[in-house]
């Protein structure tokens, strides 16, 4: 009996350890990225999370890079795992979604290719900045996107938002939700119903722990579309002085430190359409001008002939 009493503390300790392990497993999630697989296999049972698709260890105290998020999104599509409802709208220029190649730090590699061996060069946001080519295409560097313009259009309201209040609320949002340093939000412009948010960040300005404006813009875009990447959070819920801000449309423009390298081939279709429209307009203008001149000329001839006939019919004095 005494031996059983001696074992009781050990059993209680064992049960406590099992309960603690189970609790750690339950609480082991990545609050800033739901597209991860987490476990407590780290040193001392520390919770560790790896991005789906790449298995890269992510830092859950800050935002995950856009490249790793896109790779996880494409991997989820392939495996039919329902993590985040994918949007049907293209988010990378006009090329739609693609399965990106990321470096060991989770950043986009300079050259991206698809399954058909078509390749192109991208900027630090993953947006194509050259014509598409084959696997012989060379991309020497990842050109940094240093200026992002987010353009929003909100639903009609009884009255326009106060610009100062709107500015303060959006700055608070990017600082608290997206961990973006306030100095990187350059300006907030507002002309009802259009809101423009300017993010600026040079490579020399970004510190080691600073959130990249590309990642902040991508998280914001997913929030706007109701596809939040944060665990336990729904879409964006922004209120300005108690008035909800409902966004109808979002456009994001990217400005790189170096201009893009598109050739005239990319503009061929558009140029042909423009030239055709201009040509039709010119031909129509010439036709109208000729017809108008002929009508005027015909009237003048009739008047001259009529006057000449009257002169001939007059009796001579």
Swiss-Prot record:
Disulfide bonds: 67-102, 113-119, 121-139
Record bears the keyword Signal: yes
Intervals, Extracellular compartment: 25-270
Membrane topology annotation: Single-pass type I membrane protein
Pfam family, one: EPCAM-Trop-2_C
Keyword Membrane: yes
InterPro entries associated with the record: EPCAM-Trop-2_C, EPCAM/Trop-2, EpCAM_N, Thyroglobulin_1, Thyroglobulin_1_sf
Family membership noted in the UniProt record: Belongs to the EPCAM family.
Protein's recorded name: Tumor-associated calcium signal transducer 2
């Amino acid at each position: 009996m005494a031996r059983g009493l001696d074992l009781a503390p050990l059993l209680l300790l064992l049960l406590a350890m099992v309960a603690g392990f189970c609790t750690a497993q339950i609480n082991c999630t990545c609050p800033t990225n739901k597209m991860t697989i987490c476990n407590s296999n780290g040193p001392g049972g520390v919770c560790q999370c790896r991005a789906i698709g790449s298995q890269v260890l992510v830092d859950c105290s800050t935002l995950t890079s856009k490249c790793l998020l896109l790779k996880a999104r494409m991997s989820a599509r392939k495996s039919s795992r329902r993590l985040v409802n994918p949007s049907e709208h293209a988010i990378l220029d006009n090329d739609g979604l693609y399965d990106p190649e990321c470096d060991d730090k989770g950043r986009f590699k300079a050259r991206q290719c698809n399954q058909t061996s078509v390749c192109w060069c991208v900027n630090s946001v993953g947006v194509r900045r050259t014509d598409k080519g084959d696997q012989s295409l060379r991309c020497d560097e990842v050109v940094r996107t240093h200026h992002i313009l987010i353009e929003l259009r909100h639903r009609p309201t009884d009255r326009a938002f106060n610009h100062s209040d709107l500015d303060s609320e959006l700055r608070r949002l990017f600082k608290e939700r997206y961990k973006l340093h306030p100095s990187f939000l350059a300006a907030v412009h507002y002309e009802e119903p259009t809101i423009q948010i300017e993010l600026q960040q040079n490579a020399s300005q970004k510190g080691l722990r600073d959130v990249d404006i590309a990642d902040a813009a991508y998280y914001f875009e997913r929030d706007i579309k109701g596809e939040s990447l944060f665990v336990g959070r729904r879409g964006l819920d922004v209120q300005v002085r108690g008035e909800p801000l409902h966004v109808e449309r979002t456009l994001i423009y990217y400005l790189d430190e170096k201009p893009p390298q598109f050739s005239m081939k990319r503009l061929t279709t558009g140029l042909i359409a423009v030239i055709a429209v201009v040509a039709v307009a010119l031909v129509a203008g010439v036709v109208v001008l000729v017809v108008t001149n002929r009508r005027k000329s015909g009237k003048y001839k009739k008047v001259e002939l009529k006057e000449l006939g009257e002169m001939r019919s007059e009796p001579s004095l």
